[in-house]
Amino acid sequence: LGGIASHSQEQLKKIPVPFVLSTVSLLGKEYKNDYSFVSVDDVKESCRMTEHLISQGHEKIALLCSYKEDVSIGALRLTGYKKALEAHNIPVDERWIRHMDPELDSYSMESGYRMTKALLEEGVDCTAIFAISDSLAIGAVRALIDAGKRVPMDISVAGFDGTEMAAYYNPSITTIRQPAETMAKETIKLLFDSIKKKTNVQQLIFEGELVPGESVKK
């Protein structure tokens, strides 16, 4: 869930049927006003989570991110993370930023586990980990527990997406919940309106919700 469409305008023009981009946006694209989309503002929501961690006393915050080449969800949430640190005059330490291994499944718990294990093995000093998806966060928690760390007493962990799995994990994951059901309904409505030619192009940006869990030390 989330991100920015990586398709070019030429590619989108070739689609022969009405369509609506769902959970991805065209924000920042020159042709953003030409197509309908439904999404959250990934930069804003990632910034919100990072600022939440800062408000809980954390300044050394590691980020479990997407592939280095990613120009979609990973790039947007990385931008939000950096924006929050800079707003609080916290220098960005590139050692804190970890990218997924392209040979592993994207956004998998194994990816989160491996990135966190590497952080620990390299002795990177951090008090919190912000994973840009709940699955990465769960993998991070497991790696910390396997290393003898206590979550959140030793290291706090936060995620993003607001999945049911994050709510029922132990400890429950502090996360940004996307209004997935509402977004799905609005996407379908826009699509049918487009098919029936009832509406012009629309862009709907929804607010995420910060859901406190047990994985962040208060």
Residue ranges and their predicted role:
Residues L1-S6, S135:
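Short beta->alpha connector loops
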Residues Q9-K218:
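Bacterial carbohydrate/catabolite-sensing allosteric modules
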